[in-house]
Amino acid sequence: MAIRVQSTAFDPGAEVNAMHAANVGVGAVVSFVGYVRDFNDGLEVAGMFLEHYPGMTEKALGKIAVEAQQRWPLLKLEVLHRIGALEPGEPIVFVGAASAHRQAAFDACSFVMDYLKTRAPFWKKENTSDGARWVEGRDSDHAAADRWKQ
């Protein structure tokens, strides 16, 4: 399991390739990459600034990752999230789950993203054509996370 919160850019393809490197037991890798959009809620987005609570954010991500590992037979799990200034088209988040079989990898990847969106302390400020604004959480994110409650 690897949790990274960083201000530097990352290569999603390299992250996917690292998920199965030197582990021939991996039969499936499922990944999600989130990108900065150039448009949101009807406004043009020129950029975004992501803030986090150092220490608390990593702890929250680690707790989510541990829960995923307890639910599914994963061989590897990676969570990487950018902070700082980002421009449209840049990757913000990478979640990768590797398992012997595809369903565990699919489910774990979805679970981690759903919980990351609702439980990890990140704050997004968009620079839009109307000025800067904080991005609010969406009801659909909470509904997606609710499906994993046991």
What are these language model-derived features?
Residues 92-99:
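Short glycine-rich or small-residue beta-strand-to-loop segments that form or flank ligand, phosphate
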Residues 1-92, 106-110, 114-150:
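N-terminal, polar/charged subdomain of small-to-medium soluble alpha/beta proteins
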